[in-house]
C-alpha cells in the first residue's frame, strides 16, 4: 500500500507541475498528507486513507471545466484544514475539536478503528463547516451537482477500503459473510447519505438557523453513537 501511495504521489506531482501555479495548493496538500502518514502520530492512519482519496479526487476532476475545478480545489483545501488543525492540536497537546476527540483520545486502537473514526469525524463533523466557511448559500446551490458528482469516485475508494479491511479483520469479515455482502452495499448508501446531509446542513446554516440547530444537534448525536459502535464492536 505504501508503494502504491508513493507511485501515485509521483505521477500526480509530475502532472500538476505542468499546470498553473494554482496547483501548488494541491501539491502542498498531498505532501502534507503523505508526511503525516509516514509519521509516528496516530493521525497517520487516517492521513494515509485521506491521501488516497485526495489523489482520486484530483484525477476525477482533472479534465473538468475551470469553474468546477475551482469549486473542488477551494473545498479540498478548506476541508483538509480541519483535519490538519486537529492533528496539530493533538501533537501540541492543545484543545482538540470535539468531532475529533474520539479519534485522538486513545493511542491503542487498531488501524481500522482509527480509519473509521476519522471517516466519521471528517464527513459527519467537518464537511458542513468547510462548506459554510468557504461558500455562500448561492454558491452551494449552484455547485450542488459538482459536489455530488464525486460520489462515484468515493464509491471506488470505499470498495478498495472495504475489501482491504474485511480481508484482514475477523469481526468485519463475519459481518459481511453473514449478511451476504449487504454491509458493503449499506456502507456505500450511507456514505452517499452522509455527504448529502452535510450539504443540506450547510445550506440550512445560511438560510434557516433554527432548522440548522435542530439538524446539527441530531447529527452530533448520530456521530457520537457511531463512534461508540466503532470503539465497542471492532
Tell what function each PLM region has.
Residues 69-77, 86-95, 107, 115:
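N-terminal amphipathic/basic membrane-interacting segments and domains
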Residues 33-37, 57-65, 86, 90, ...:
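Secondary-structure edge/capping motif, primarily at the C-terminal ends of alpha-helices
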Residues 98-161:
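Active-site-proximal alpha-helical scaffolds that flank and shape metal-associated catalytic sites
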Residues 1-22:
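Bacterial Sec-dependent N-terminal signal peptides
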Residues 37-86:
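N-terminal interaction modules that seed assembly of large macromolecular complexes
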Residues 24-37, 56-59, 99-105:
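Short, charged/polar, low-complexity loop and linker segments
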Residues 69-70, 108, 139-188, 195:
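Extended, low-complexity, amphipathic alpha-helical coiled-coil/linker regions that act as scaffolds
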Residues 24-28, 182-234:
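A cross-kingdom marker for long, charged
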